[in-house]
């Protein structure tokens, strides 16, 4: 059985790591903004002290400013904690802000995998369509 005081301190620490106050830990999800819900979910994952963090569409539903803030937060945590982050995203700005390596899935197959800059130059209709004219901006 874990000590209640230890759990409270852990919750406060992990909330602080994602930019939230201890009071946010007492609120129900409906009382939080979309960005705060994402941050609470991230704090919950960090409570387990992971080496690998799995994120599924981490910025979905966030406005561009909150999305950028979340990308910066995950990037900071990745560097500070030495995390490996595996992420599913369709958001090019999230990909540009966090990814070093990319796997592109199409037709139930991995059609490209490697460093971000290399994958963006793959001559495949899906890859060129997905990255489109934004290729240069994303590198």
Please place each PLM-identified region on the residue numbering.
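H-loop/switch region of ABC-family ATPase nucleotide-binding domains
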Residues: 89-90
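Conserved ABC ATPase "signature" region
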Residues: 6-23
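A short, surface-exposed alpha-helical micro-motif characterized by mixed small hydrophobic
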Residues: 95-97
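Conserved catalytic motifs of ABC-family nucleotide-binding domains
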Residues: 49
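Catalytic Walker B motif of ABC-type/P-loop ATPase nucleotide-binding domains
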Residues: 53-56
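Conserved ABC ATPase signature
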Residues: 28-32, 36
């Amino acid at each position: 059985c874990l000590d209640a005081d230890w759990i409270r301190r852990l919750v406060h620490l992990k909330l602080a790591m994602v930019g939230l106050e201890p009071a946010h830990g007492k609120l129900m999800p409906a009382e939080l903004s979309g960005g705060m819900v994402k941050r609470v979910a991230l704090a919950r994952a960090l409570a387990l002290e992971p080496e690998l963090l799995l994120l599924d569409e981490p910025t979905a539903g966030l406005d561009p400013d909150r999305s950028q803030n979340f990308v910066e937060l995950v990037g900071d945590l990745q560097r500070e904690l030495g995390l490996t982050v595996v992420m599913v995203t369709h958001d090019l700005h999230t990909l540009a802000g966090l990814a070093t390596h990319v796997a592109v899935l199409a037709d139930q197959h991995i059609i490209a995998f490697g460093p971000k800059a290399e994958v963006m130059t793959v001559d495949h209709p899906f890859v060129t369509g997905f990255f489109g004219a934004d290729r240069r901006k994303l590198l």
